[in-house]
Regions:
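C-terminal cap of metal-dependent C-N hydrolases
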Residues: 7-13, 20, 330, 342-380
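Divalent metal-coordination and catalytic microenvironments
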Residues: 9, 24, 29, 50, ...
Length: 380
């Protein structure tokens, strides 16, 4: 077994407090030990004194590899807008593993992402959790399926009601489409004819995967909770821009939320109440919070900046780091593999020149499963 020892860094395991002057020992793509570690004589040693070592960031809501950037509408593979319910489509089938966004992710210290269909349809399709390196999309997969994407609010109203003059054209219609689809899934009998979309929906009803609902506005957030309770399903609330306005309801419901994108203007009516205070307010109320970029809508390279601004506006530093690592890993069902630096987990980690929330901090090296996949300068 080839071993690698990163020595002398300030290590942030996330699952426990930071450790100064610690060592991370890895071998065969896994973490072997963290802390005061006896270094094997045959290990390759990287002297990381003065550096900061963290788990790779986990971005739980992106369109990395799926959504064109700078190449126009023909490359927008995020929304299969031909029908309001498209649970049968799979994000995996549209991922371009050679897309520049994967290199951007690695250079920003993001080693795991969930990539997913867009929010044009009330029922959008199958989501997938992937690592940000690999020669094929299948090689990247960490969990599939990781959820069923759905959407409330303005996007499905506009795309279907306004643009195509069909249901849904109102918030009532959007919720009705979702309810009707889940009701059909309850009655699904594969012996009467196979339906890939209803098969996925049955996984939601059986609580094998969650329904992940796009909801910015407070009333849409409450509708998401209402639907999840009606069908006794697992839910994550995506965006949750006005979550701070219904924080008590979120805390009582107990569903995880994924906040963002926050680094940008209030470009749509649903983001009129966007604030960087949202993460801190929800954290203090005990809500399970993760942060997202929604790449490319906030470039994945700016993920750490959102965390820093959340801290400035009231979130704890430890909470913000957790919201970018272990919390999303837990919410995505992959915390046994990624999200913290613990023995037995994948050796996905990042060496930073400073704490990642400091303005001048930069990624010096990114490792995925013990292999260096990005390097800013020589460290050995």
């Amino acid at each position: 077994m080839t071993k690698l020892a990163i020595t002398g860094a300030t290590v942030y395991p996330i699952s426990r407090p930071p450790m100064a002057g610690a060592t991370l020992l890895v071998g065969d793509g896994k973490i072997l030990a963290v802390g005061r570690v006896e270094i094997p004589s045959d290990a390759e040693v990287v002297d990381a004194r003065g550096l900061h070592l963290l788990p790779g960031f986990v971005d739980p809501h992106t369109h990395v590899g799926l959504w064109g950037e700078g190449d126009g509408p023909p490359a927008y593979d995020g929304n299969e807008w031909t029908s309001p319910t498209t649970a049968q489509v799979r994000a995996l089938d549209a991922i371009n593993p050679f897309h520049v966004s994967f290199a951007d992710a690695r250079s920003a210290g993001v080693t795991t992402v969930q990539t997913l269909p867009g929010s044009g349809n009330p029922i959008g399709g199958e989501m997938v959790v992937i690592k940000t390196r690999g020669r094929t999309a299948d090689e990247m997969v960490l969990r599939r399926p990781s959820g069923l994407k759905g959407a409330l609010g303005e996007n499905p109203k506009r795309l279907h009601g306004q643009n195509h003059k069909r249901m849904p054209a109102t918030r009532m219609g959007v919720a009705a489409v979702i309810r009707q689809f889940l009701t059909r899934a309850r009655a699904y009998d594969p012996e009467k004819g196979r339906d890939l979309g209803l098969e996925l929906a049955r996984k939601v009803l059986d609580r094998e995967i969650p329904l992940r609902l796009h909801a910015h506005r407070a009333d849409d957030i409450l509708t998401a909770i209402r639907i999840a309770r009606e069908f006794s399903i697992d839910l994550s609330i995506e965006h949750c821009t006005e979550g701070w306005m219904v924080v008590d309801a979120l805390a009582e419901a107990g569903y995880p939320v994924t906040l963002g994108p926050m680094l940008g203007g209030r470009s749509k009516v649903e983001t009129a109440n966007l604030t960087f205070r949202n993460p801190g307010i929800l954290e203090k109320a005990g809500v399970h919070v993760s942060l997202m970029t929604d790449h490319p809508f906030v470039p994945i390279a700016h993920h750490r900046i959102q965390g820093a601004l959340a801290v400035r506006e009231g979130m704890s530093e430890a909470g913000a780091l957790r919201a970018m690592t272990l919390n999303p890993a837990e919410m995505l069902g992959v915390a046994d593999r990624v999200g913290s630096l613990e023995p037995g987990k994948d050796a996905d980690f990042v060496l930073w020149s400073d704490h990642p929330f400091r303005a001048r901090a930069r990624v010096l090296a990114t490792y995925i499963e013990g292999q260096r996949v990005y390097e800013a300068k020589s460290l050995s």
